[in-house]
Amino acid sequence: MWQLLAAACWMLLLGSMYGYDKKGNNANPEANMNISQIISYWGYPYEEYDVTTKDGYILGIYRIPHGRGCPGRTAPKPAVYLQHGLIASASNWICNLPNNSLAFLLADSGYDVWLGNSRGNTWSRKHLKLSPKSPEYWAFSLDEMAKYDLPATINFIIEKTGQKRLYYVGHSQGTTIAFIAFSTNPELAKKIKIFFALAPVVTVKYTQSPMKKLTTLSRRVVKVLFGDKMFHPHTLFDQFIATKVCNRKLFRRICSNFLFTLSGFDPQNLNMSRLDVYLSHNPAGTSVQNMLHWAQAVNSGQLQAFDWGNSDQNMMHFHQLTPPLYNITKMEVPTAIWNGGQDIVADPKDVENLLPQIANLIYYKLIPHYNHVDFYLGEDAPQEIYQDLIILMEEYLQN
């Protein structure tokens, strides 16, 4: 894939010399903006905060306190927290046009919208003591995101808004860490009104994602290939490709194949003219250890804590020789689920096995033509998901 993009760069240079591909090559302005700038660009108010976890990680979170047509000084608006998926960031919820982005639609519907970022991504790469240049900083996975990131962020929102509970919307890994957190931390679970799970991932036994190829490699080989720190960060080269190459119609298919390598995509349900915006904010990075945790999940077919590789390390972390399984049947949070029939990450078979384990399932919808990214990028997402999601929130408020 990198060879294809390098070839695209040469073609771009040659094309510019001869005036080739002049049409359709203007970058969207949001491709060169950060999250706050995108929110402001579309006329919405925003606030930025740093949230510090108990283990010292500093997370960047963003708030859209109200919509464009809503006055700021009114009665408190119900808080909604949106949590992105694997190797992604809060930008996922705002990278489409306002009438197609969940964060903006919620704000315009009268909600106080909060956007989270998992440790190690572009907007959450700080620590009280550790340097991101050190392997120690990157010694985390799903376990720490569920144990530290979600409680810190949710408690911060509750304290800031003065509300006792909030709505939680997660996509992909954003659902995984929620299932873990809400099943192991009953006090945190009590603070959730409804858990909206988009493309939920608890087991990946049947996944067809290229991520599965990691399972064929030993940990030693993975660390030789990727190191022991950051996996798939957003680089200056990525930004160049996004804004100078992928904004051109000629290269959109190549770029989309690169961007959606792990998840797949349907060009018929994406606004391909915004591909430069998608690629300029993704991938946003995670830790190699987190990817090893996902490889472990593929191999085991179960949701369990990270296996540290030897019994001594496991004893130190878990007080037992093997990593414990997570029992999501203990989660009592009202849960609504949407999954896709073409999803190669949250495979329909895995979701089918998940449903009976959810103690309080209040809504379920299978969208036959959906793949993994349609839940936040799909052009028909407002009709397929967001309208019903907002109706469920309104019904909760009325009751």
UniProtKB/Swiss-Prot annotation:
InterPro entries: AB_hydrolase_1, AB_hydrolase_fold, Lipase_euk
GO biological process terms held by the UniProt record: cornification; lipid catabolic process
Protein known as: Lipase member K
Tissue expression as described in the entry: Exclusively expressed in the epidermis within the granular keratinocytes.
MF terms (GO), sorted A to Z: lipoprotein lipase activity
Subcellular compartments: Secreted
Gene source species: Homo sapiens (Human)
Disulfide bonds: C246-C255
Gene Ontology CC: extracellular region; intracellular membrane-bounded organelle
Pfam families: Abhydrolase_1
Signal peptide range in chain numbering: 1-19
Principal EC category: hydrolase
Family: Belongs to the AB hydrolase superfamily. Lipase family.
Record-linked Gene3D superfamilies: alpha/beta hydrolase
EC code: 3.1.1.-
